[in-house]
Amino acid sequence: MIERSNSTPSATPARPPLAVDEEYNQAFRSKSFLDLWSHAHHHLTHTFSSFKLSTSTPCAGRGGAREDDFLHAGGDGGAADDSEQSCSYTVLDDFVLEPSPESLARGARLQQRRRRRPRRHRVETLLIEYFDVTEEACEACSALLAAIGAARRHHLTLRRLLLRLDGGDDDDAKDALARHVRLDNPLSPGSLSEFHDVHARCSPLASRLAAAQRRLRRLARALRIARGTAAAALVGACAAAIVAAVVLAAHALVGIGVAAAAFGATPAGAARWWGRRAAEKVSSRHYARAGATLDAAARGAYIVGRDLDTVSRMVRRAHDELEHGRDVARIAMRGHGERPLLQEVAREEEECEEDLRAQLAELEEHVCLCLITINRTRRLVAHEMARGLPPPSPATVTTTSEERLTSS
């Protein structure tokens, strides 16, 4: 301690720079993320032809086949590398939504059988909407992954056409480039309408779930206060009856029987009877369990909504970067084959390709992380729902077993 206090600030060793990228990778790439990422890249070993067949998009059918034939006719040595890069997009065939819609439907049927009057409450309606929205969010993320792959192929085709245009093949390259630029941007809002729709539904759903959870909390508190007040009033009434019986017993022997009957109806027994009757109608525990389920659903909808916010901003950035490359290609088309202009366009496209590749890779990672978040929140809500369910009766179990045997 003395040596440290006597040392001058100049003698203090310099602190090593903070490795932000390393810390980010350690925090971001958890085990669950790496598992899903390995599933996502399961199809990287497939050939480029089979990949195109499995991930064909509507915009590829409007002249895209002719352009691909034109591009691959060049026979350049970088075709294998480009096809490997274009395969970086993968479809999550191994991803399983948990809990599955079939299990949710089966649980809803079991819950309806336990009721005397099968009707849907507001809590159940909100929970069903939550599971529907998260399922649609999963489908939207899958569609976004397809759009990421289409964006990679779109920009790769753009680069190759510009290289052919720079190489002197003006007529064919210019016609193919004109057709390609007229295609829609794969990351445009019109192409990702499903993603933007489900993104817009998350925030209102989280607000409604939180409002319903607060309402159940107020109902549970009011029920506890009402039960306590009713119990106190019942105890007071029983005490008044006992006092009246004692007064009557002092004036007549008949009062002894009345007093005995009053003592038999003790406040504790009356309170227990009233508690059983109230519990048959509604229980504060029911409100507490339903409130816990709604709280988990509200948290899940909020988290999924924030993840979709991040993904939406990243999609906007990647869309602008890809659109910048398309604008540069339009400038090259209007340049009448001028050599300096084509060289400047090639340099600009090379820089755009590096930025776009990094943005699409980061976007793909965040989409996979969003899928993990969707599964985790759905499992938490299903766990809270299972905690509040009573054990199934033997008749229900027998009926369910018969249904499974019939379906199998």
Curated annotation (Swiss-Prot):
One Pfam family this sequence matches: DUF677
GO CC annotation terms, alphabetical: membrane
Keyword Protein biosynthesis on entry: no
Annotated transmembrane regions: 224-244, 252-272
Protein localization: Membrane
Alphabetized UniProt keyword annotations: Membrane, Transmembrane, Transmembrane helix
Keyword Transmembrane helix belongs to the record: yes
InterPro entries associated with the record: DUF677
Family membership: Belongs to the UPF0496 family.
The name this protein goes by in its record: Putative UPF0496 protein 2
Annotated organism of origin: Oryza sativa subsp. japonica
